[in-house]
């Protein structure tokens, strides 16, 4: 591997962190509010509009089809992304994804904590048969030897299962049910100091790394500049299974160390879990739950309304018939009068013609 290539990877790694990671409050430096826990094992199918109590679109516009949620770049300055409103404190994230094809375009799955621990899957759009794995701890990007490269056939046209298995002892990346990489706590950067170990939310999205203004190493890593004439570039998220290994309603940092031992799991019912397990009821479900007496009342009320409408219609029909008969009688009288006038006119005309043996005006 050439030095130039390693430097390119290093620069790209830094850019990836900059482009994909941010935090609204860093508990390494300040006291932050607790994170909402997921606290359960659940599956999300992305073929309809997202529930904004669970998922937050952080940039751009997403579209939803029978196949899944689409993250699409159609022009410059676009990077559609979303993230979960919940956090998991160790667990499993099983994502079924098709990457976006196109030089310069990066598709990504990111688990990230408030103190910038990070676990990544990334696809560079020019290579549709490879996915990259990576990790960071506390935002540290001093080294560039953390990445892994894994073969995946037809990653842009076929859905594959990319699973992250994460505990305090080890981190595993799985592809279609086969283990691709293992990182232990002890083998991570800093002998565990920079091992991802604090509660993370989940982020999905695509972004253009191959754009003018980015470092040359970043552009080369991404496969060159983006050719927007070949747009759209689309990543598709079909479904996600998330298993939070802790139960509770919130995760709280008790100090500024960023260690997993410092995280307090606050007992209680997760509001996110409640939203998932008890979604708003449909009209049919609400109707099914009504007692028999209430249903009878609804039927009677509906019957009364129907009867009133029918009576109104009958009254209107009768009134219209009476009105029609009156109008018909008036028309008959008018017709008879006009016929009498015409008969008189014809008689006068004939009398004039017979008397004068020719045509004469009739007054």
Curated annotation (Swiss-Prot):
Entry's transmembrane regions: 298-318
A Pfam short name: Glyco_hydro_16
Matches recorded under PROSITE patterns: GH16_2
UniProt-listed GO biological process terms: carbohydrate metabolic process
Intracellular or extracellular location(s): Cell membrane; Secreted, Cell wall
Gene3D superfamilies: 2.60.120.200
Signal peptide start and end residues: 1-19
Active site annotation, chain numbering: 118 (nucleophile), 122 (proton donor)
Gene knockout outcome: Does not affect growth rate, germination or sporulation and displays only minor sensitivity to high concentrations of Congo Red, even when all crh family members are deleted.
GO cellular component, as recorded: plasma membrane; side of membrane
Protein name: Crh-like protein 3
Gene: crh3
């Amino acid at each position: 591997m050439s030095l130039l290539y390693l430097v390119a990877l290093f620069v790209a790694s830094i850019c990836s962190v900059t482009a994909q990671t941010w935090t609204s409050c860093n508990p390494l430096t300040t006291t932050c509010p607790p994170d909402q826990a997921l606290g359960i094992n659940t599956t999300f199918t992305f073929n309809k509009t997202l529930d904004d109590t669970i998922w937050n679109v952080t940039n751009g516009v997403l579209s939803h089809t029978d196949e899944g949620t689409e993250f699409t770049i159609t022009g410059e300055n676009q990077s559609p992304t979303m993230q979960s409103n919940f956090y998991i404190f160790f667990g499993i994230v099983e994502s079924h994804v098709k990457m976006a094809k196109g030089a310069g375009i990066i598709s990504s799955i990111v688990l990230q904590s408030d103190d910038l621990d990070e676990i990544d899957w990334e696809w560079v759009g020019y290579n549709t048969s490879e996915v990259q794995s990576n990790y960071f701890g506390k935002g540290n990007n001093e080294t560039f030897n953390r990445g892994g490269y894994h073969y995946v056939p037809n990653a842009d046209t076929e859905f594959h299962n990319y699973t992250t298995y994460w505990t305090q002892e080890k981190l595993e990346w799985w592809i279609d049910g086969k283990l691709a990489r293992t990182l232990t706590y002890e083998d991570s950067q800093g002998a565990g100091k920079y091992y991802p170990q604090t509660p993370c939310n989940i982020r999905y999205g695509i972004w253009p790394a191959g754009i003018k203004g980015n470092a040359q190493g970043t552009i080369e890593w991404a496969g060159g500049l983006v050719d927007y004439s070949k747009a759209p570039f689309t990543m598709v998220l079909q479904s996600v299974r998330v298993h939070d290994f802790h139960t509770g309603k919130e995760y709280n940092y008790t100090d500024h160390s960023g260690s997993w031992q410092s995280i307090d799991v606050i007992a209680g019912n997760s509001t996110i879990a409640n939203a998932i397990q008890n979604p708003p009821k449909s009209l049919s479900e609400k109707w099914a739950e009504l007692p028999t007496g209430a249903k009878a009342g609804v039927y009677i009320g509906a019957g009364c309304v129907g009867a009133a409408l029918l009576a109104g219609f009958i009254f209107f029909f009768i009134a219209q018939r009476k009105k029609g008969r009156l109008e018909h009688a008036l028309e008959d009288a008018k017709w008879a009068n006009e016929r009498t006038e015409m008969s008189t006119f014809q008689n006068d005309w004939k009398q004039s013609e017979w008397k004068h043996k020719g045509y004469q005006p009739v007054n």
